[in-house]
Each structure stands twice: as structure tokens, then as C-alpha cells.
Amino acid sequence: MSSIAAHSAGDILRSISDIKSLDLFCSIAKGNMESEILKETKGLTRKQYYSRTRQLLKTGLIKRSKGRYYLTCLGAIVYHAQLVIQTGVNNYWKLKAIDSIQSSAEIGEHERTKLIKTIMDDSRIESILVAQR
């Protein structure tokens, strides 16, 4: 059994749960980064840097080769899921408006879909909301 098989979604989410770990993870995702550049630009102590990268490596989100960090395939999936979450957060008030309209009136499925497509301007969020019900 590989070491990654023992990790749960909770382990993975915990490894990016604080803002500095998430920032480090996103920086690696945006371009394979050299260790020295990451250490200098993220404002982490040496211990903080190494404990966070060790956790990201341990959960299988990143890998290191020739002094550079890269996302693994699992890391790419987690990064894209995080982007969807961030899009949801950025559209919080639009989502609240949809919730409010849905709860204040009985609307049919067609009207609900039309409402979502009118208010939302992100196709990923639209497809998630249309599929929900």
C-alpha cells in the first residue's frame, strides 16, 4: 500500500488550512518554484517553511525535484477545487441573493435555472448550482 493511500480528504485539507500554507501551495501551483525563492518571498521562518512544505509533500500535493517544487496530479485537483471555492467566496452576495429568492418563493426548476444563469457569471458555479436540488 502506498503512503498516499493512507491520507484522507481531512489530511489534505488540514495541510492547506492555514493562510500561510495555502499561500505557499498556491505559489507553487502558479509556477514551479525554487526553494530559495519561496523561502525569501513568503515571510516564513525557516521552521515554518520546512514544516509546511513537509506537510504538503507528505499529503502528496507537491513533489520536489532538483530544488524546485511542483504540483502532483492530486495537487492540481486540489488547487482547482480551491479556485472554485475562491470563486464562490468572491460571489458570496450573488449566492446569497439566489438563496434568498429560492427560499422566499416556490419557483419551478426552469425558473430556478434561469435565475442562476442570470445572476451568476461563472460557468463552473452555474453548473454546480444547476445540478444541485
PLM regions with names:
Residues C73-S103:
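Conserved segment of winged-helix/HTH DNA-binding domains
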Residues K42-K58:
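Short amphipathic alpha-helical interaction segments
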Residues E36-T41:
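A short acidic, leucine-rich amphipathic alpha-helix
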Residues L22-C26, I77:
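Pre-recognition alpha-helix immediately N-terminal to the DNA-recognition helix
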Residues L57-R68:
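A short, conserved structural fragment
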